[in-house]
Amino acid sequence: MSNPMRPVRSILLAIFTGCAGLIGYALYLQLVENLLPCPLCVVQRMAYWLIGLTALAGFFHTPETTGRRIYAGLMAVFAFTGGLVALRQAWLVRYPEAFECGISPEEAFLNALPLARWWPVMFEANGDCADVTWKFASLTLPDWSAIFFMILAALSIYVLLVRENQRE
């Protein structure tokens, strides 16, 4: 008899690993490539952290149906929120004239949070949201982030809707 939670646990572990990899790459871009995170980047980092930690909690907890749905629902909300922020940043990259220069209220707010003081390398916003310094396959960093958030949202919805009696 196979464990019906095994596919779900594998997906949760994959979600956690993916989020950890994305956060690691963001730190690489910041610390090695000197690409400073903007306020919207920091919010996306927070969303990746929340998704990843929720997936990790679900992986270790291995809850029944209701608990699994709560974890998956939270991950989906975090993924959709992060995706909206990434799409907003992608819009700002394409229409930089809509962006005001100087310290934004978002930057001041984020930098005043305890997270920014506790771990400034990860959560302090110092960059310009409309600055395009990185592209891959003609897509900017916010474009790729939006794609990854969509993938994470889809996986979260799958975990939310999968039936327990499904076989491997």
UniProtKB/Swiss-Prot annotation:
One GO biological process term: protein folding
UniProt keyword annotations, A-Z: Cell inner membrane, Cell membrane, Chaperone, Disulfide bond, Electron transport, Membrane, Oxidoreductase, Redox-active center, Transmembrane, Transmembrane helix, Transport
Cytoplasmic membrane side: 1-11, 64-69, 163-168
Annotated membrane topology: Multi-pass membrane protein
Transmembrane segments: 12-28, 47-63, 70-87, 144-162
Periplasmic side: 29-46, 88-143
Gene3D superfamilies according to UniProt: DsbB-like
Domain of life: Bacteria
Keyword Cell inner membrane: yes
Main subcellular location: membrane
GO cellular component, one term: plasma membrane
UniProt-listed HAMAP family: DsbB
Protein name: Disulfide bond formation protein B
Underlying gene: dsbB
